[in-house]
Amino acid sequence: MDRVSTAHLRWAYPWKTLLQSGVVVAGGSDAPIETCCPFTGMHDAILRQSRDDEEDIFRPEERVDFAEALWMYTIGAAYAANSEHFLGQVYHEYTHVWYVLDCVVTLL
């Protein structure tokens, strides 16, 4: 966060505040600058820890829980892409993309 002034840091990544205000928040990445792995983004939204120091938590009041992070990266992302009527949920009329994982996602 060295590139952002202290005055502006309070507005950085306010996920919890936005969700509580009724804003549709879309999870995503800035690939190729950041990883395109949604689990990394979800992990960061949930824990908000520094990659260098796990004790350094950026604005802990803006943490989201697992369900909120999953919502951001599924339904929220589909909404942002104007595709919420056929993506983002497991529903018989929706387009499905399935991933098989070899771990418990809630532990990521």
Question: Predicted segment positions?
Answer:
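His/Asp/Glu-enriched, well-ordered alpha-helical/loop segment
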Residues: 1-104
